[in-house]
Swiss-Prot record:
Family note: Belongs to the PAPS reductase family. CysD subfamily.
Cystine pairings recorded for this chain: none
EC number annotated for this UniProt entry: 2.7.7.4
Alphabetized GO MF terms: ATP binding; sulfate adenylyltransferase (ATP) activity
UniProt name for this protein: Sulfate adenylyltransferase subunit 2 1
Name of a matching Pfam family: PAPS_reduct
Biological process according to GO: hydrogen sulfide biosynthetic process; sulfate assimilation
Pathway named in the protein's UniProt entry: Sulfur metabolism; hydrogen sulfide biosynthesis; sulfite from sulfate: step 1/3
Organism: Shewanella sediminis (strain HAW-EB3)
Quaternary assembly: Heterodimer composed of CysD, the smaller subunit, and CysN.
Taxonomy of the source species: Bacteria, Pseudomonadati, Pseudomonadota, Gammaproteobacteria, Alteromonadales
Keywords attached to this entry: ATP-binding, Nucleotide-binding, Nucleotidyltransferase, Transferase
Length: 301
């Protein structure tokens, strides 16, 4: 790769090359679109990779029924604006059971509405490759995951049964029923993502920017009161605080951080001084009985 490219242009070129290779190599790929900052970068890269043509695979959102309202609105706006094929899947069994992170807990909610829902959708549509926005700097189990992450016929990830990746050579051979999770952003950092969003003018949900929002402090985490379904427990007060989100997911399981960063340059400045992981606000990551590695072995993203 040219030494004259900036590090962001090198990362961009690497990601685009991975996307083009998957589109050429697999029969039925899909991009998992979770509506966050990494998904927004993936969408931007996919549009660049196949411009001026249409993105040659659909985008799929596994909707848990508990996403921030703004995320759903943003998702639909992006689909209408850019004209990509959007698949939205909700686990019908979970909906029928009335699964809620408040009444059933974070582990059961994640297992049924996210993991089981994702596996249902992949099987239903017969996808043999699925793009995801995970990065190696996010979390320790993701740090050892390959760009082409092999999954067996049950969508399980076995960290001891992965393929060597030499330079930019990837092995995409799968038998019927098996699949590959593909992570084009593996070598990006959170700071890279924000700098790229700023330089490329990529649209993101405004939840990433600091604003006054209604929150409740629960177990040391600031949870935003996004709708009327959130129960306020005895002794809790809804407070209006200047907060933003470093990561987005189900609103009852995603903690806000107090911040004054209302613009992208201010977020980047904040990232340069930050010493904590962006996933510190994810309640599911604090559930020792359901670690990320265990979830991935069961078929999680």
């Amino acid at each position: 790769m040219s030494k004259h490219l900036t590090h962001l242009k090198q990362l961009e070129a690497e990601s685009i090359q991975i996307m083009r290779e998957v589109a050429a190599e697999f029969d039925n790929p899909v991009m998992l679109y979770s509506v966050g900052k990494d998904s927004s970068v993936l969408l931007h890269l996919a549009r660049k990779a196949f411009y001026p043509g249409k993105i040659p695979f659909p985008l799929m959102h596994v909707d848990t029924n508990w996403k921030f309202k703004e995320m759903i609105e943003f998702r639909d706006q992006m689909a209408e604006k850019h004209g990509f094929d959007l698949i939205v899947h909700k686990n019908p069994r979970g909906i029928e059971m009335g699964i809620s992170p408040f009444t059933h807990g974070s582990a059961k909610h994640t297992d049924i509405m996210k993991t089981e829902g994702l596996k249902q959708a992949l099987d239903m549509h017969g996808f043999d490759a699925a793009f995801g926005g995970a990065r190696r700097d996010e979390e320790k189990s993701r740090a050892k995951e390959r760009v082409y992450s092999f999954r067996d016929s049950k969508h399980r990830w076995d960290p001891k049964n992965q393929r060597p990746e030499l330079w930019n050579i990837y092995n995409g051979k799968v038998d019927k029923g098996e699949s590959i999770r593909v992570f084009p952003l593996s070598n990006w950092t959170e700071l890279d993502i924000w700098q790229y969003i700023y330089l490329e003018g990529i649209e993101i949900p405004s939840l990433y920017l600091a604003a006054e929002r209604p929150v409740v402090e629960r177990d040391g985490t600031l949870i935003m009161v996004d709708d009327e379904r959130m129960p306020i427990e005895s002794g809790e007060d809804v407070q209006t605080k200047m907060v933003r989100f470093r990561t987005l997911g189900c609103y009852p399981l995603t903690g806000a951080v107090e911040s004054e960063a209302q613009t992208l340059p201010e977020i980047i400045q904040e990232m340069l001084l930050c010493t904590t992981s962006e996933r510190q606000g994810r309640v599911i990551d604090n559930d020792s009985a359901g670690s990320m590695e265990k979830k991935k072995m069961e078929g999680y993203f």
